[in-house]
């Protein structure tokens, strides 16, 4: 952790004078072992029902995945000459199953659209996590990182009707843990995220979750690491029943 970072503040920015921390941000290990993670405070996120109104600015509720448009961002010009109007956004989309599974206290995921393999979080402090029986009753997921895609949007649509939660924050590189909210869905509809919206993956309230995914094929990823940058984890509630 950077020097002079006071953990209780939950808001200490990264000190980029430390090259080892810079490496963790630019080249993250997306499958960290729990025993390699520090014991830190947890910032519990507010839980909000995912509706068209609450998702304004973040994305959209998806009723029909076949008809959902995926935004593709045109490649940015490097100088005063513009990118030709019929170019720079022709990479298209890629699709596949986003599969999540709780293995004891550890939430693992694979994004078959882009070949991603992740540890999304833990149901307790990662140093205490077991891949056998759950250490504690699973009532929340501790999230350790987030990212956004500047090249395009992303869709998740449940293949089985079960509740899930997606933590989100609005675009901006100066994001803080306090900017995040946890959006709850009952599993009857899906979620589309605009480009540049901070997210990680899907956090199922049940043992497993499978979601049809579609996103920009370029798959640029800009990341934030909460333990390294802010000295905390984000706690996403995982209720199985609606509280709204």
Descriptions of predicted regions:
Residues 154-157, 190-191, 202:
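His/acidic/aromatic-lined binding-pocket segments of jelly-roll/cupin-type domains
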Residues 232-234:
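Compact, glycine/acidic-enriched structural inserts
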Residues 3-5:
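Ser/Thr/Pro/Gly-rich low-complexity, intrinsically disordered segments
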Residues 9-182, 215-224, 236-244:
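Non-catalytic, conserved peripheral segments adjacent to functional cores
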